[in-house]
Amino acid sequence: WKKPTVLNNVETYANVPQIIQNGGAWYAAIGTATSKGTKVFALTGAVSNIGLVEVPMGITLREIIFDIGGGIPKKRKFKAVQLGGPSGGCVPEAYLDTPVDYESIAKVGAIMGSGGMIVMNDRTCMVDMARFFMDFIQDESCGKCTPCREGTRRMLEILEKITHGHGEPGDIDLLEELSDMIKNSALCGLGQTGPNPVLSTLQYFRDEYEAHIHEKRCPAKRCAALVKFEVNAEVCTKCGICSRSCPAGAIQWQKREPAFIVKDKCVKCLSCITNCPADAIS
């Protein structure tokens, strides 16, 4: 139409009137030397206060999650935070004091992206989390370029195989090889950043992948195919919460007695594990 056109995110448009009204120097006074202004994050997941938060660039992840977000509810432990939307990376506890700016976030394997910030506690399986995001990325692939179309599909197949208890020793190397190929040859940002959830979880939580593959065990007890659904009588507090929460009536329990799971009735919904206050079910 022979008219100038501006294409940007809504967040960028929202900042423009304030910059015009108050001046560039006012805006540049907020943030860091290389990342100016504020950033809006959608804070969600295993955190007490969820919602949209606007913070100055340079604030740390710890301040956002624990000071603004109120920390992890139900006395669970912080495990990781996923930044940047589906193609972002997972950052572990060791990097909670990372400043929120473009350069620092990139150094720990994540991206600012769309401003998504998903907090995860110790009951989150990082392999299953990578599978979840890869499922989304594969579904969103337009199919134009082969690396993204076929590569993400193959990565998803491997992750599904691992979480279902059929992982093989070479799967980790293959995931890394596919990730490198997709990042370097995909045509657009989706494919180039798509492997991030897998690469970051492999970097920081490689032991979970190895437990799934070599021990056929899910440390977080979220992959039903790798859970035995057995009650540890020595750890069980005999509270009966698991029995009351079981939708299939598969858990036998009497007062002052440890619970017992009838495996023929168990539908592996994980409700007992989610609700057990003593983590007595494995």
What is each PLM-predicted segment?
Residues 72-107, 203, 270:
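Terminal amphipathic helices with adjacent charged low-complexity linkers/tails
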Residues 141-144, 235, 265, 275:
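Short pre-active-site segment immediately N-terminal to redox-active cysteine/selenocysteine motifs
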